[in-house]
Amino acid sequence: MNVIGADPHVMYDEKSGYYYCYATSGDSDTGKYFYIYKSKDLVEWEKVGYALDTSINCWGKDWYWAPECYYNPNNEMYYLFYSARINDDLVEEHFENKNYYECAKIGVAVSKSPEGPFINICNKPIDYFPFDKDYLDVDQIYENIFDVRIKEEDLPKGIVGQYIGTIDVNLFFEDERIIMYFSRCCYKNARHDKVLNKFIEESHVCAVELNTEWWFDKDAKMMPTIKEKFINQNNLGTIHRRDGFINIINHSNQPQEWEDGHVNDYELSGGKSPNRRWFEGSTTFTKIINDKKHYFVLYSCNYYVNELYGVGIAYNNEPLGFFTKFKRNPIIKQNPIKSLYSTGHGCLVEKNGESYYVFHGRETKTSDRVIYVGKININSEEDVYVSDIKQCKLVSF
């Protein structure tokens, strides 16, 4: 049997000697979310159950996506990070617009065991209000932005600044720093493409640095907080809090053709779907190459049903700031000959001195997403490839 799930994150648990996989499980009638599996070899997996129990401190409405679990040696607790759309009564507080559609935020739950249950630390998401102070809100200028054809130099003046929804959280630990990577949602992020001469809604990979006090809380009751320099960094003179963030991956900084899987969706769907570009599902890590530390980000582009959906990689000499995309992206993509479709959104795992990428894919264009694993080979910033891709198997459930 296949290991069903999407957006997998794998953590090795030294206490038990198991690899634990946490994956998006879809909607729930029971208030429990995110599949848990465990394995000794990354290929054969046992089903454990569900990770998150929202019967206590529930702040999310739906869109429970992309769980990631981290073991904290300071208090011997396990921390589950995830994203969800917030309850209706919280939307205006976080976005200054009660009708904000993609109102996703990041939450944190804890457990004494990697097998859960994970309980939310509090009844609100992380205290973070990311705001793009430079964004021109064209939705308030044009009735339908996807019907507009306008040259870049003719863009009108308008309302500037917008809160952003956040999904696909990933933590990076280095020395005494904790950096939180995430994707800003496409909604309310329409960018004018001067080549295509039209608006495209885009998601971007972004980051913010966290304080570390919560990581040393012996009682595991403290929520993560962002560094003070980011708090209200993008305020435009209002009484509302507007926090900063750092861009990591987007389209305009270094365009690549494979990122354009959905830029004509509005026309092709007869106006039912927006034109979009997705940069999501990031995971950050380092490699020592020729005695030098290199920072890498793996990420996914496009929506998983599209034939161009795949995995890219980018590199930098520091963990913050724009990363340089690998010239031969994507490094994982669909392969109909091998019945491999919808390849994306995974995590890096180390095993016996080798690096592996655990990700989701599909056997057909219509089947459920299931878990795969492949060996990732990084010889330099210009020599990266994935080999020996295997479909994971469920051996106990």
Predicted regions and their residues:
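Carbohydrate-active catalytic/glycan-binding domains of CAZyme proteins
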Residues: 1-397
